[in-house]
Amino acid sequence: MNGGSRLRVAIFCLQYFSSSFCLFKKRPYICNTRTPKPLNNAQIGGRFIFIAMSLNFNKSYTTPTSIVQLLRERRLGIADESKALHYIEHIGYYRLSAYLYPMLAEPKSNHRFKPQSTFSNAMSLYRFDKKLRLFLFNEIEKIEVAFRSAIANIVAEETGNIFWMTDASMFANGAKFLRTITLIEKELKSSKEEFIKHFKEKYSNDYPPAWMLVEILPLGTVTRIYENIANNALRKKIAARFGLPVPVFSSWMTVVTLTRNSCCHHTRVWNKENAIMPMQIKKTARAWISSSVSPKRIFYDICILKWFLDIIVPRHNMKTHLKNLLDQYPNVDITAMGFPKNWEEEALWK
């Protein structure tokens, strides 16, 4: 092919031999750059053809003025053009488009807005999402601090090894440990924290003790360190502090980390699907939510945060803050966030 587009086609014919493969019989399996999906009623076994396609991106830059004109042509109400231009220039249309998308009429590929859709509605949703991120981050901070404290102190207390975080014998997977050491050395080299400077100047040890390291490492790294601890009894004791079995605790801390990162990087969170599905707790003596609540949406993540806070800060006011935020924006579709109709009647929220 020539011109503005390029097509790459890879065809693989594979034979199903064992249960370790999941192939689709007599059906094409076609994907773009995302996860491939089988067409129609694909079946296990037999052969399949895998076709991977990619095209050159050929869209051109559009000025804010042209964008406003295009939005009007697509039937979006814009009461104040100067304000719309200001927001597009200072926020960026690409970011704002995520808040315009829910207002598109079906089929959305026609790019026509539903009746009564306005630019002001999109900005209101944008502000709600911003306040939601601030709310979430404020709650996550308490969980993050508690987790850092638990992992550093419990392992040191149980083993008597204050340098356990840089001791290869403490970990199950050597390759993962080496990657962690590389990250630790990188953080130590770049850290401007006074306590790290003081340690380097005063002591000859290669690495600081765990309670110092845990303060400079990213939350995701700390979570992976937890997962790689060889002694399962230690992992159980850390998870038990938060009322959870090891697999669920590990899964939920990953969700907390991803949500935290979304908040830090100003990513849309209000109606976004979880990149990683949180593990669902099956048996618990503590109040939790019904199985009908979707683990794909942010409400499930909010429930996870509340679980942790009920243990870490028993007299917290998370529910009050959440209700106040939702009351400020009554036009937000909370079902798109995964909220069930009577969410306050769930055992966790009573």
PLM regions and their residue ranges:
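Extended intrinsically disordered or low-complexity regions, especially N/C-terminal cytosolic tails and loops
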Residues: 2-6, 10-258, 270-350
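Acidic/aromatic/glycine-rich contiguous surface patches that form carbohydrate-binding/processing clefts
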Residues: 266
